[in-house]
Amino acid sequence: MKTANLKSATIAALLGLGVLTGCTNSTTNQKTSDNMETLNLTQEWDKKFPQSDKVNHRKVTFRNRYGIMLAADLYEPKSAEGKLAAIAVSGPFGAVKEQTSGLYAQTMAERGFLTLAFDPSYTGESGGEPRNTASPDINTEDFNAAVDFLTAQPHVDAERIGIIGICGFGGMGLNAAAMDTRIKATVASTMYDMSRVNANGYFDAENSADARKQKREAMNTVRTRDAQNGTTTPGTPGLPAEIKGDEPQFVKDYFDYYKTDRGFHARSVNSNGAWSPTMALSFINMPLLSYIHEIDNAVLLIHGENAHSRYFSEDAFKRLKGDNKELLIVPGANHTDLYDRMIPFNKLEKFFKSNLK
């Protein structure tokens, strides 16, 4: 195993640990069966990055094994010939495919891969009720379902499929790679371990049975009240409406991405909504990274030098086994720099071309 360095600068965290969506204009209804919900998919280019003239793009849908229909953007290089290596992309936690994951996907398509950026279950344009919730099991399955979809595409070589998980979906991606042997290469970029941060708090500051009990009691009180009253308690937004100046730096960095024109999107939970107040319950009791030491295929962890979340990747890297595992630290970068400003695409291209061949 090896640790590499790169160059870059600015920002720091995630808002999706039980703390931290939408609208469309022109839409198309898509339905896969009479038993499935209809998705209203916008057909306009409403993404936070310009459309590439080197890539063909189209909206697609597919179901996971829980019957939830997922919405995705498929990117294919216009110069494509024959069957291609493919990459499924998702995250950050609380973001939509029109934000970071779409930027990763389109750029990797420009570099020769067929790519798929999808909205996780219960968020964005994907289906699932109630809205704005998450699950370590179902969101891991979302990655596995994306692999299902890619294996069935005529221009994809089913033996050359990788994934990119960003932020909270970095941990989900590692969990998917630990169970899905079809995934030949995995990147976790600016990763959060959502189980650990929900159970233990930031930097494990709440890592005690008493602290976890208090969290469980608070969330189960909400469940009881909702059951008795037939209501659904709304969540509290993870980001403030405005920055006052005394917030932790990582909150300022999140705000700079999700709440400004740089990254704001109306369908993003982190930009324009709030997570279910009971969302963290399952994460507390279901450790995502339990079996990552059994991943045989290649893994690349990428994190910013100045990211508050860097310890998630460093600790995960210590548990990975084999010479095909790598940790890349991007100098000067914080957590959200890897959302858009300092993504090491040359390294990503080299990694996937080396391991999807």
Residue ranges of predicted features:
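N-terminal cap/lid segment of alpha/beta-hydrolase-fold proteins
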Residues: E37-G82
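Short beta-strand element of the alpha/beta-hydrolase
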Residues: K83-P92
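The serine-hydrolase catalytic nucleophile loop
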Residues: G94-Q106, P120
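Conserved alpha/beta-hydrolase
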Residues: T107-G127
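Alpha/beta-hydrolase active-site loop
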Residues: T133-P154
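Alpha/beta-hydrolase-fold enzymes
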Residues: N175-Y257
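Short beta-strand/loop motif that positions the catalytic acidic residue
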Residues: I295, L301-H303
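Catalytic histidine-centered segment of alpha/beta-hydrolase-like enzymes
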Residues: A333-M342
